[in-house]
A protein has these predicted regions:
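Helix-coil boundary/capping segments in enzymes
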Residues: 1-223
């Protein structure tokens, strides 16, 4: 079996809730050429980022299964709490539907915001027990309720990892938002080519320093 272990899936423009475009949180243009946020846009480089086209692309390239991770643009950092909860819940429901409709083709991830631990635990329980999602996607760093950037592996977030360990989840740690707390000009893809590696290294440093690989042996973690 050939498995794509790091895949992303974009919603079609009409699948994105209107409030997300109205508030410039995230949207796709009608021609499916760009994904956009306030003061940011990135080209959609291939039609296979969308569901039906991805299925065709997988068949053409003899890929049997794909692990679909959450969109990095929708980790919720910097959003108000109610907006963040709506965005994350929508994304998790979207991924759950993809997995439910195509269980032989996709294993999909879900996301929570580590800055609000209690609501994060509720969402983990919902995604695992109601939606049958088993891959928890987390950023290397998150913005806490005081406006401070913290590594995801922090004493404040330990209840999240305790629950992930209880459920035996796969946990995928993905770098993003580096330009929001690393004070350098965003040019020459430096945040993708250099600083994302540094973010992973920083996160991994605290993962091992705090002994989480030993404390949570049922939690399978990748960076």
């Amino acid at each position: 079996m050939r498995i794509n272990g790091h895949s992303h899936l974009l919603p079609y423009p009409e699948e994105i809730p209107a409030f997300m475009k109205e508030k410039e949180i995230f949207w796709i243009d009608e021609d499916r050429k760009f994904m956009l946020q306030k003061n940011w846009k990135r080209p959609v480089t291939d039609s296979s980022f969308f569901l039906h086209e991805k299925l065709e692309w997988m068949a053409k390239n003899h890929i049997d299964h794909a692990v679909v991770l959450n969109l990095s643009q929708l980790y919720g950092n910097g959003l108000r709490m109610e907006e963040m909860k709506q965005v994350l819940r929508w994304q998790n429901d979207f991924n759950a539907k993809v997995q439910a409709d195509h269980p032989d083709k996709f294993t999909c991830g879900f996301v929570i915001h580590a800055g609000f631990v209690r609501s994060a635990l509720w969402e983990i329980e919902r995604c695992v027990e109601e939606l049958d999602l088993r891959v928890l996607c987390l950023p290397t760093h998150y913005l806490d309720s005081t406006g401070t950037w913290r590594t995801i592996f922090d004493p404040e977030t330990e209840p999240i990892f305790e629950l992930a360990n209880h459920y035996g989840l796969a946990v995928e740690i993905h770098p993003y938002d580096g330009e929001k707390f690393i004070q350098l000009e965003n040019t020459a893809w430096r945040f993708h080519l250099v600083w994302m590696l540094a973010q992973c290294a920083d996160s991994y440093h605290f993962f091992t320093l705090n002994g989480y690989h030993e404390r949570y042996p049922n939690m399978r973690t990748c960076f």
